[in-house]
Amino acid sequence: MPKRTLQGVVVSDKQAKTVVVRVDRRFTHPLYKKTIRRSKNYHAHDENNEFKPGDMVWIEESKPISKLKRWTVVRGEQKKTA
């Protein structure tokens, strides 16, 4: 079974070797047929502390690393600065 991969935006990098990633999803409400946005935060392992808030990253499921971390950062794109 392949590992799940999610795309999200780094919200926080205040913990050592950990980033908090916000993953947004959109779905249609079954009764009202309105498109709804929901988001969820995931704690992900960032070995080299290379990602900062605002960066787009892809996270992949992994074995439990700590109490909250079950995801690792696979790759990412640095936020463009002007």
UniProtKB/Swiss-Prot annotation:
GO terms for cellular component: cytosolic small ribosomal subunit. It comes from the Bacteria. Gene3D superfamilies: Nucleic acid-binding proteins. Coiled coil: none annotated. InterPro entries: NA-bd_OB-fold, Ribosomal_uS17, Ribosomal_uS17_bact/chlr, Ribosomal_uS17_CS. Disulfide bonds: none annotated. One of its GO terms (biological process) is translation. Transmembrane segments: none annotated. Pfam families: Ribosomal_S17. CDD domains: Ribosomal_uS17. Keywords: Ribonucleoprotein, Ribosomal protein, RNA-binding, rRNA-binding. GO terms for molecular function: rRNA binding; structural constituent of ribosome. Part of the 30S ribosomal subunit. Belongs to the universal ribosomal protein uS17 family. One of the primary rRNA binding proteins, it binds specifically to the 5'-end of 16S ribosomal RNA. This is Small ribosomal subunit protein uS17. It comes from Nitrobacter hamburgensis (strain DSM 10229 / NCIMB 13809 / X14).
